[in-house]
Amino acid sequence: MLINRLELSTLDLIPQRDYYANVLELPVHLEGDSLLVKAGKTDLIFHQAPSGWTGEYHFCFNIPENQFPYAKAWLSSRIPLLKDDKGNDEFKSQSWNATSLYFKDAAGNILEFIARHDQKNSVNSPFNNGQILQVSEIGLASKDVIAFAKELCAKLGVSVYKQDLNDTFTPIGDEDGLFILPVDGRIWYPNTGVPARMLPVKVDVEVNGKAFQLEGVPYEVR
């Protein structure tokens, strides 16, 4: 599953523009009430939210599978990394065969770099912004995770990813694109104190050559 376009809300576009341009060094374009960030294969778009809006999203960027230590050094020289309650700032998943780190953008969204070691995308050049390959995960909270996961799997033709259905946390999709489905109110990893919430989102995905769009709260697939 490929996430071609991801549209989110934010309260202040200017700090987001400066963050993605200066910290992650990604191409950005601010026009009117929208900010376009070119994140590799994905168009990441932030729309101006109404005054008083609150909310933090979780989304993730794939990086080349051999670049994790270099990506960590590159990013940690610019901004603090998020840590768990033991002080760890890198996280290995045996079941996913992946290594991750977490950080926040200017709006407080929980971002992630993940190196998926089963992917054949190694590079030999030093880590740079061009190795932010695509948005590969977006968190979508719901009140009933199992029902939501079953509905999405049926409509999109994807499967639960490397685990069984779980009523508090279920990922669906594949290594190129995952919907991360937590129960509403679950705290985003690692020890962020930020609860997953049902927030407005619009995401265009491609599954086996077929295009789908998920939008709104509650989310609808078209």
Locate the predicted segments by residue.
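Basic, Lys/Arg-rich alpha-helical nucleic-acid-recognition elements, primarily the DNA-binding modules
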Residues: M1-S51, G55, N62-P64, A71
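Short glycine-enriched loop/turn motifs at secondary-structure junctions
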Residues: M1-L2, W53-G55, S95, Q131-Q134, ...
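Hydrophobic, well-structured mid-protein blocks that either form specific transmembrane helices
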Residues: G87-Q131
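Vicinal oxygen chelate
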Residues: L13, F61-A106, L140-R222
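Conserved catalytic-core motifs of GNAT/GCN5-like acyltransferases
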Residues: V28-G32, R116, V160-D164
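A short, sequence-level motif marking secondary-structure junctions
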Residues: A49-W53, H117-Q119, D184-Y189, Y219
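Short, charged/polar, Gly/Pro-enriched secondary-structure boundary elements
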Residues: L44-I45, T54, N109, G177-I180
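N-terminal beta-strand motif that seeds the catalytic metal site of vicinal oxygen chelate
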Residues: M1-I14, D118-E151, K155-S159
